[in-house]
Amino acid sequence: EDKKNRLISIMMGDIQTVVNAVYGKLDMIFLGALSNEGKFVFDETTNPEGGVKGSISFNQPGENIASCKTAWTLENIDTVDCFEDIQAILDASQDKVALAKALLSPSRISYMCRTKKMKQLIWGADKSSKPVLLRDINDFMETNNYPVFEPIRRIVRIQKGREAIPYAPWNQDNIVFVPAGELGVVKNAYSDCELKPDEGVSYSKYGRIVTSLWSVGQKEGSKHTEYTKAESQSLPVITEMNGIYTLKTVA
């Protein structure tokens, strides 16, 4: 069984790598836009190998974006009232949409759990030295019919030459409140290889991702080399932006 799995890994490893790279780029665009007020920028960091440049915007309404009353910084950890900022978002949205989740980075969760006022909110002033965990905050939120917090930990790898650089697309300073259900769609078009396939290339499909496999070197008697590529003419589109709210925790 182990030999079989290793053989499958050798045969499918390159294909899985390039397919995952396409999924990673789609996640990067979606999570980047979702956590940056509906905007995503193609630049040297997000697209170092060139091609598409510029930015896209899904037009989050200005009234859906709020800044914290006090910056969520280490200097303010004993005075900042995280829930006051959260309550302001809930108040602003209550007549427009039913929010289900608050998406945020692990660092924002850790900060909330360590603040003095959050400990007092969860445990009371007499037990404010007791540690607060995410499940404690979410128990409080669920009890009061508020959206629960969900950490975003996605890391993608961006190809830059021969190096794959880890990149976190989520803006760790923002908390994004979303309604239940799907937030958008992935729009697709036919790729070039679907419209005009090349000779000597083997193609396969994974959903709307097309992989290409070809070899060089055999005819010339030189070293045989195989190449694998994945291609997808796709763009994630956030369709529910009018019901999505952003809290900027660092003013």
Locate the predicted segments by residue.
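Low-complexity, compositionally biased segments
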Residues: 17, 46, 50, 62, ...
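Short, surface-exposed beta-strand/turn modules with glycine/proline-rich turns
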Residues: 60-69
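Sequence/fold signature of self-assembling virion shell proteins
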Residues: 68-71, 75, 119-251
